[in-house]
């Protein structure tokens, strides 16, 4: 007995259900497209007009958008198409767009998505104070913000952020070199009560005055990165030890004025510090120079 012939081309077996015949909002969007990588969805929408409509409906309902999922570089026109209908975003990461992202590209997206809670703009050097103002004013639920390596962030921009973001918990200001102690002091006084994580790394303008004010106003601070803050010294670290009972990690590498005596109290509490105690450093150096590996116990 010969097996039945399978349908070919556009033929369809009687009673068969096509993929696009399944309920879009009840089945395809929540149970299928949500599990497909964004890069694959962009290819899928080229199959037909129906698939394009399905993908656009999915994009309109996105809660999280990370441009890195599209690729290391994403053209301006592609980003505009992807986010054209999105109005419910809660997380937005645009680091791969850093070479060209401007206020004109970003501000309309922020205006359509007031529910944003997490925004990553690291390295986006073409933005300005206008974009940060739109974010602060239009997204009152903002909790996490990365502005790392955004040289345009100055004291006035940070003041606007501190005034309008009551829910702010995590802030990355790495290499925002225009910021000085006065701006950080204002941030601490306005938003310190809720701050849990802060990076001020690679900023030679930040000193003990800023660190001490953070310590006094940020009782919930868990993580503080002061890497390369050359003006920070032992006084600032002692104040952290006194006023920040839940501090879990402290980064002070290349802070040459921070003495071990100020760090020891934090070490005893189990705070993770990226600088080894002097005795440990000496033993490692001895091991490297003299080849005493079998004889030196590095436990201190």
Curated annotation (Swiss-Prot):
InterPro entries: F-box-like_dom_sf, F-box_dom, Leu-rich_rpt, Leu-rich_rpt_Cys-con_subtyp, LRR_dom_sf, LRR_FXL15/At3g58940/PEG3-like. Pathway: Protein modification; protein ubiquitination. The keyword Repeat applies. It comes from the Eukaryota. Residues 113-269 are annotated as: Interaction with SMURF1. LRR repeats lie at residues 141-162, 167-188, 194-215, 220-241, 246-267. Residues 19-66 form the F-box domain. PANTHER family: F-BOX_LRR-REPEAT PROTEIN 15, PARTNER OF PAIRED, ISOFORM B-RELATED. This is F-box/LRR-repeat protein 15. It comes from Homo sapiens (Human).
